[in-house]
């Protein structure tokens, strides 16, 4: 009020005319500050102390006349020009007018002597008259308005809007009226610059937080202060520029719920399942067995990782059984007994150096290896003979006229008759090799051409009614050989450990 008196009183104007040094430089700008026609233009010294220009949105419908009267009555309006003009006051005031001196002293006493530090904070800008509503919360304007307009607003439906809560509320809720002569064109330009920038969602957008914020924002609609009359065009401008942040209504997201089946559908499904189970239970065992075998074969094939090949039946069934026995990891007792003789014969030949075999004369490999359990044509075992040389192996049993060991098969496996052991009435110990005359080898002579000794039989020589299981040749075509390692080497036949690898290999 005191500052108003100094500007309105007649003595002050007369002293100003007489003593121009007491007048404030550029005093013409002071009354122009209250007119809404043109913005204030201060000197360089005043621009240094002038607070930062605040780009806020003003509305043309405001009554500027009432605003001028309010500014004249508020003492805070006159404090700002007094602060800026005290730097040019003279050190000793003139004594022409006592009233002006007293008013100036009072005004100077109110001015703080500290240095002016403007940090562009909203608290110092708000010292000027701001028409605020009674419900306005000044704590929202703690952040500087310059920061709100300088940084780009990157808004999208997936953007965390909580970061821009203060800035958006400041721009949209309240029109900041710093001075009645605010430049409206500059404010609109700054708002358009902010909103025309590309809206790009940050990579780390928090969707749940933005949804909650939007829902809260629509529950409490923004209302302008009662003292301000905001036109509808401003809202249309904002809604056109930033469509992402404006949601018409806070509606919950639709949840895609699968319709539950009706009771009739459930009953029909349960009935179908029961019928399927009954059909499976009443199905034929052949179908289930075939499916099980196919599944087992497929599983075994995947496990081994090899391709299956079609099995071609052999002409002779005994060969199939022999092949199965050869490829088994653990032989049964019968097959193990058969190959155990071969194994024992090979080990004894390596130890003694005498290789005894039964083969055709022109073969390089033996059809059978002779061991201690092998039987001679005379009916005695090899261990019952005495090995003198390769040409003399007489039988040591009394009253036996056998002078040379002659091998004869004593087991049905050696002649390829594997099926005989499957008969219930078959006795392996009673089995003997027979001649075509239907008599056994024991009923033939042990020497010479082995004529038949049965009364009334006119068989002059033994002719086997079986074939060799190794070469499919008759018994009389084979011979028994007693050889040493040197003989084997000269005949280019396997010896040593090679005998175990090359058994039953015909010429």
UniProtKB/Swiss-Prot annotation:
Protein's name according to its UniProt entry: Protein FAM221B
Location of the region described as Disordered in the Swiss-Prot/TrEMBL record: 1-100, 154-310, 486-507
Q: Does the keyword field hold Cell division? A: no
List compositional bias (Acidic residues) regions by residue number: 167-177, 208-222, 270-281
**What species does this protein belong to?**
Rattus norvegicus
Q: Which UniProt keywords apply?
A: Phosphoprotein
Keyword Lipoprotein annotated: no
Disulphide-bonded residues:
none
Quote the biased-composition stretches of kind Polar residues, using this chain's numbering. 88-100, 182-193
Task: Please state which protein family the record places this protein in.
Answer: Belongs to the FAM221 family.
């Amino acid at each position: 009020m005191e500052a108003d008196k100094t500007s309105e009183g007649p003595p002050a104007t007369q002293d100003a005319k007489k003593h121009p040094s007491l007048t404030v430089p550029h005093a013409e700008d002071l009354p122009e500050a209250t007119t809404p026609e043109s913005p204030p233009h201060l000197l360089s010294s005043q621009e240094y102390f002038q607070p930062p220009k605040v780009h806020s949105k003003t509305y043309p419908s405001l009554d500027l006349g009432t605003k001028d009267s309010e500014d004249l009555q508020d003492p805070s309006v006159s404090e700002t020009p007094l602060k800026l003009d005290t730097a040019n006051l003279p050190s000793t005031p003139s004594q022409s007018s006592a009233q002006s001196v007293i008013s100036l002293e009072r005004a100077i006493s109110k001015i703080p002597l500290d240095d002016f530090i403007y940090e562009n904070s909203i608290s110092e800008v708000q010292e000027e008259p701001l028409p605020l509503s009674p419900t306005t919360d000044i704590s929202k304007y703690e952040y500087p308005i310059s920061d709100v307009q300088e940084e780009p607003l990157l808004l999208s439906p997936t953007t965390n809007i909580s970061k821009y809560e203060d800035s958006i509320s400041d721009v949209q809720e309240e029109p900041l009226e710093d001075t009645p002569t605010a430049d409206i064109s500059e404010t609109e330009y700054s708002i358009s610059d902010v909103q025309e920038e590309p809206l790009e969602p940050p990579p780390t957008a928090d969707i749940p937080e933005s949804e909650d914020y939007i829902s809260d924002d629509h529950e409490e609609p923004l209302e302008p202060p009662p003292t301000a009359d905001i036109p509808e065009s401003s809202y249309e401008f904002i809604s056109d520029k930033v469509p992402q942040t404006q949601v018409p209504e806070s509606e919950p997201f639709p949840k895609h719920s699968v319709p539950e089946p009706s009771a009739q559908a459930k009953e029909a499904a349960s009935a179908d399942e029961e019928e399927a189970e009954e059909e499976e239970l009443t199905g034929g065992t052949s179908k289930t067995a075939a499916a099980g075998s196919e599944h087992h074969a497929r599983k075994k094939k995947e496990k081994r990782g090899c391709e299956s090949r079609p099995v071609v039946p052999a002409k002779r069934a005994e060969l199939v059984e022999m092949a199965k026995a050869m490829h088994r990891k653990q032989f049964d007792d019968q097959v193990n007994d058969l190959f155990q003789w071969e194994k024992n014969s090979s080990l004894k030949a390596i130890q003694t150096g005498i290789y005894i075999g039964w083969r055709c004369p022109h073969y390089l490999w033996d059809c059978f290896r002779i061991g201690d359990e092998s039987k001679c044509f005379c009916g005695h075992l090899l261990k019952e003979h005495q090995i003198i040389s390769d040409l003399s192996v007489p039988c040591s049993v009394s009253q036996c006229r056998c002078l040379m060991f002659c091998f004869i098969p004593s087991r049905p496996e050696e002649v390829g008759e594997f099926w005989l052991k499957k008969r219930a009435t078959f006795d392996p110990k009673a089995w003997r090799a027979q001649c075509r005359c239907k008599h056994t080898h024991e009923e033939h002579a042990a020497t010479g051409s082995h004529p038949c000794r049965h009364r009334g039989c006119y068989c002059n020589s033994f002719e086997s009614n079986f074939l060799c299981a190794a070469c499919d040749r008759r018994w009389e075509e084979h011979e028994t050989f007693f050889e040493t390692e040197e003989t084997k080497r000269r005949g280019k036949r396997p010896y040593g450990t090679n005998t175990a690898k090359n058994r039953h290999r015909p010429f």
